[in-house]
């Protein structure tokens, strides 16, 4: 085993929560150093984007149909960003104000940043690299240059680079923050996928480039422009047709200017360094190894409201209304169908262990949604030998144990009522040790990205059904892995938890428009 894999395995074990101890953090909220959730580049030219609130969008139920493709113009770029990474609303309570975005984020801390690499357009005869500033709904132009690179892509295609500032999560969550950073990258990716579908566009992650190349493309290697480190996550191709995940960007890199415009704003007056995060960031920055491809999800849904209304109303709920959280079998099946097949075009590596509490026609108990049938034999071998593996009305959903898991699910989720008071909660069970050994340490991030994509999809799908969802990053890892599932090794690990039900709306919290002055 190489040193990078050793670092990843050590990081994961060290940052597990248990009944004896939680992963290390400061142990208090250091409000004086709270990071600014909005990155801006001082000195960069701003392109104000038009708001898309009045743009018609297809019903959410039709998003997986072959919708007509919008042209690549400023209006469509604006809509893509507003309905994925933009602000959905502002909230006010007890003198405090905070933004709610379309993409979910652990603790609403938003470590993810987005950069667009665009061909000549928007009355500009040069290609450009710009940063999306969601607070002002604007593009900050970092570089303008000539290149023939876009001639190698399908017409009207462009690139989006995602990056992360780990300090935003580490400020609150300490050494476990790297996990949440990767989940949020997955949240953002799937938010972009959903928004792109409204425009008849497709998004594919490039899987044959290095983190170093992405950093160079986005200007993240120009360290004098940054106070806090910002690390590359992924490069996405946005196109009208499904693209190949393999892309040669050498000509693009050759055409980049040596220095970009704009200086990144300082997010905190000071920082607390977490060496273990720096170590795992370095270990996972290896060249990625492409995964086997798979058919993407295409879900048939009941008629629903406009897509934009669904994504703009996505919220993370802190309290579930237990008495109202009974859901129908059809709602349950719709949620499962939405994430049953591949979201990222790769073979699924994540399965769902569900604590079913209040679902009509389903007995209370522990269930497993097997998202890749290739793993079924292995899962049966590794889980408790006493499990039933009884087939249900939903294909690839198995009843493992009949029991009331409301108390257990709450304990596992760091004693949070949201895990027990909804219709169901779940743990995302990932192929783990063999997966990392086969595909190297970069795969650790990719597993979290897949979990984040599932989480964002469940958020949006629940919203479309009039329900609420909430991601749960705080859970007792091995209480789930070992006690509940019976795992005796690390072939599988639970990486992210989630809950769905009917959320309590606090009338004391006021809502304001996302962009009131625009």
Regions found by a protein language model. Name each.
Residues 1-457, 464-518:
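N-terminal accessory segments that position/regulate proteins before the catalytic core
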């Amino acid at each position: 085993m190489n040193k990078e894999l050793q670092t990843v395995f050590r990081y994961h074990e060290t940052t597990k929560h248990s009944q004896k101890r939680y992963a290390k953090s400061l142990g208090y909220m250091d409000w004086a150093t709270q990071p600014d959730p909005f990155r801006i580049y001082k000195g960069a030219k701003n392109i104000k984007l038009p708001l898309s609130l009045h743009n018609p969008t297809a019903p959410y139920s039709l998003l997986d149909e072959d919708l007509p493709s919008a042209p690549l113009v400023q209006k469509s770029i604006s809509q893509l960003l507003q309905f994925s990474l933009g602000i959905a609303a502002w909230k006010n309570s007890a003198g405090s104000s905070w933004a709610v975005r379309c993409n979910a984020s652990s603790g609403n801390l938003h470590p993810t940043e987005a950069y667009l690499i665009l061909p000549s357009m928007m009355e500009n005869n040069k290609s450009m690299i710009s940063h999306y500033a969601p607070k002002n709904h604007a593009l900050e132009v970092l570089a303008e240059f000539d290149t023939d690179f876009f001639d190698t892509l399908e017409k009207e295609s462009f690139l989006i680079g995602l990056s992360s500032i780990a300090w935003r999560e580490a400020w609150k969550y300490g050494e476990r923050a790297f996990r949440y950073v990767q989940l949020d990258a997955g949240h953002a990716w799937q938010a972009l996928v959903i928004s792109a579908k409204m425009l008849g566009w497709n998004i594919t992650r490039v899987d044959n480039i290095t983190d170093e190349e992405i950093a160079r493309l986005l200007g993240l290697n120009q360290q004098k422009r940054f106070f806090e480190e910002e690390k590359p996550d992924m490069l996405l191709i946005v196109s009208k047709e499904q693209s190949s995940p393999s892309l040669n960007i050498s000509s693009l890199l050759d055409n980049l200017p040596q220095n970009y415009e704009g200086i990144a704003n300082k997010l905190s007056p000071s920082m607390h360094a977490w060496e273990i995060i720096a170590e795992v960031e370095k270990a996972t920055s290896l060249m990625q190894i492409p995964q086997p491809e798979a058919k993407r999800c295409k879900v048939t849904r009941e008629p629903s409201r406009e897509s934009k209304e669904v994504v703009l109303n996505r919220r993370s709920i802190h309290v579930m209304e237990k008495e109202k959280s009974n859901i129908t079998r059809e709602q349950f099946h719709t949620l499962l169908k939405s994430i049953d097949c591949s979201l990222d075009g790769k073979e699924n590596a994540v399965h769902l262990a569900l604590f079913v509490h209040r679902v009509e026609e389903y007995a209370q108990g522990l269930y497993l949604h097997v998202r890749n049938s290739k793993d079924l034999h292995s899962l049966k071998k590794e889980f408790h030998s006493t499990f039933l593996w009884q087939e249900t009305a939903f294909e690839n959903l198995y009843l493992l144990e009949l029991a009331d898991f409301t108390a257990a699910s709450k304990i596992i989720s760091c004693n949070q009522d949201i895990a027990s008071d909804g219709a169901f909660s779940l743990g995302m069970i990932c192929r783990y040790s063999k997966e990392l050994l086969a595909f190297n340490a970069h795969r650790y991030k990719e597993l979290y990205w897949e979990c984040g994509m599932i989480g964002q999809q469940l958020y949006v799908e629940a919203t479309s059904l009039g329900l609420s969802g909430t991601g749960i990053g705080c859970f007792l890892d091995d209480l789930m892995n070992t006690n509940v599932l019976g795992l005796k090794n690390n072939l599988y690990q639970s990486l992210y938890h989630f809950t769905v039900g009917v959320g309590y709306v606090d009338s004391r919290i006021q809502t304001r428009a996302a962009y009131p002055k625009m």
